[in-house]
Design a protein with these regions (language model features):
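Structured mid-to-C-terminal alpha-helical surface segments
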Residues: 1-18, 29-41, 45-237
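Glycine-rich beta-strand-to-loop/alpha-helix junction loops that act as flexible
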Residues: 20-25
Length: 237
């Protein structure tokens, strides 16, 4: 995955047309070390326009290493799904998904260029990645926490506040702007009920556990209380 990220953002055309977003961006760029497994590279189309040239360039960049992907296109997104084998023993099948948001061509706080480096036995590379501020990445995570039932979103927000020291006031302000763009205004009480209901669902709790290394200690109840107290209580301010 790290090689694919370097390959994409080393390409002059792609780095001007795409911005890195999502959980993988948080763990690769803002957290001290990646804390959970991820097989998704989430990117945003920066400039409105045809997606074809971008897809062609991504495949010319990645296919020589990863092979031919399956392509899926929906309203607002395009996904390239690759299946490969791990480079080191034991060899295991891996999946890498590159998902492009073709709907949101903006950054509330402006796009950021962050250095990224990979050093391994199999690949060395450096690039500057076009991405979002920490708080904007977490604001879109907050939106995901409301809109879907995946405990990894709560985990990422917890890390963002505790380790990366993100500003919860900025997160909420940016979250509100994203929701306003969608035409989907949500109040704090409704969000608290939404998250409280999810905390009772086994699938929400178990979602992140399979993604964590054995040495990572995570308390979802503590995370729930933290996000509620630091973020959700500010939505109505």
């Amino acid at each position: 995955m790290s090689r694919a990220i370097v390959d994409i953002f080393s390409n002059p055309f792609l780095t001007n047309e795409l911005a890195f977003r999502g959980g993988t961006a948080l763990h690769k760029l803002y957290f001290k070390v990646p804390r959970r497994y991820s097989e998704d590279i989430d990117i945003v189309q920066v400039n409105a326009g045809p997606i074809g040239p971008i897809l062609d360039t991504i495949q010319k960049t990645l296919n020589p290493v990863l092979g031919e992907p399956r392509r899926k296109q929906t309203v607002g997104s395009v996904t390239l799904s690759y299946r490969v084998e791990s480079e080191g023993p034991p060899v295991v099948p891996l999946r890498l998904k590159v998902e492009i948001n073709t709907r949101e061509h903006f950054a509330i706080m402006g796009f950021q260029k962050i250095p990224f480096e990979v050093r391994s036995r199999w690949f060395n590379g450096v690039c500057r990645i076009n991405t979002f501020t920490l708080e904007e990445l977490l604001a879109t995570k907050l939106r995901a926490l409301y809109q879907r039932r995946k405990g990894r979103d709560l985990f990422d927000l917890w890390l963002g506040l505790t380790e990366a020291k993100a500003d919860p006031v900025r997160i909420v302000a940016i979250f509100k702007q994203y929701m306003e763009v969608e035409g989907n205004i949500i109040d704090g009480i409704s969000f608290m009920k939404n998250l409280g209901d999810k905390m009772k669902h086994l699938g929400f709790i178990s979602d992140v556990k399979s993604l964590l290394p054995a040495d990572v200690v995570y308390d979802e109840e503590f995370s729930y209380n933290l996000i509620r107290d630091k973020i959700l209580t500010r939505i109505d301010e």
